[in-house]
Amino acid sequence: DAHTVHALDAAGGKELWRFTAGGRVDSPPTLHEGLVLFGSMDGRVTCLRATDGELVWRFLAAPHDRRIGAFDQIESVWPVHGSVLVRAGVAYVTAGRSTYMDGGIRLYGLEPATGRIVHRGLLEGPHRRIDGQRDVAFYVPGANSDVLVGEGGRIYMRQKPLTPELKEIDTEVLSSKGEADVGLHVFSTSGLLDGSWYNRTFWMYSKRWPGFQLANQAPKTGQLLVADEQTTYAVRVFYRRNVHSPMFFPGREGYLLFADRNTTEPQIVGEAGSRPPVQWLPQSDYARGRGDQMVKLGSKAFGGDKMIGYTRADPALWMLWLPVRIRAMVKTRDVLFVAGPPDLYDPKEPFAAIEGRKGAVLVAVSPQTGQEIGRTTLDVPPVFDGMIAAPGRLFASLIDGTVVCLPGRSQP
């Protein structure tokens, strides 16, 4: 919120330099060959020298320098996310909020050293007329802006696949429920920076955009993901469900941490090629009709309402229930770290733990077996997705604005 990027000494935490941008920076900067690249809410991309924070170049990605009031600050009509995607020597950024607003979302591929435009594109609309072309029910052909992701030679913005030259790639809509084959990549249906944990939104590492379908029973799906070359690690918060919505009850089973092979894909029961689903989560009951009859979540009755949604045909590699509200997660070579407030429920102060007033817990887990290796406490919880690892050290950004460094066993 202070529009500021800080460089700290990794060993002692001393501030080495700081740089103030023209708008807030909503996600971590990108380091590339001695440069610090980041976007900001004033519609610009900035490049600094990593050694001393000196400005190398600045690029206006917004089509005009026009400002509006947004989220208690003055921002560009076309903001730029903080994290910049660098692929094959090109820095990719977007400027804009939605393909349906203000002329759409501008796309740029820039030369990191100079800011020179290498590629450019535009995602705009589509704007349908009432008497014109109609879209498949539950499929939204437009998109909101998000941090860019690179996978398999493509650039992705949520459900929008792009070529490295920033040309949009057509996707196949698979059913009237709005599922689409968008290509394998990590995405969030509400945006990778959304930490609100609305119960019908999901992070997924999948080929499919879920559309109308719920994904609370799917593999490689949860409220936060980490993936390496072979395995995806996920946090599942809403593992119960009534008819329409996934549910969670604080202070009961805890939060589910689990692992899947990257080759395990979600499936819809009954579609061509699907296999019998694995029942792996606590199943919920719900009232059907107006009577007292109760049927299980796996019932065919779901076919007439919200349906089961995506399921799995192969079991998870491992599952671990933890009494920790996991808000941050990072994997090193041989340890998976998760951190967050304890899963406590006090009837007198029901939101105390969730709001961070009960401290936090950091847990180390074996990525191979799912066994807990160790744990420690933190005075303050991390911000959402606010933990990284560097050689021999673990860094966390906390909700009180501080940064902590936890040394590894070999560090002093």
Sequence positions of predicted segments:
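Noncatalytic, solvent-exposed loop/strand surfaces
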Residues: 1-412
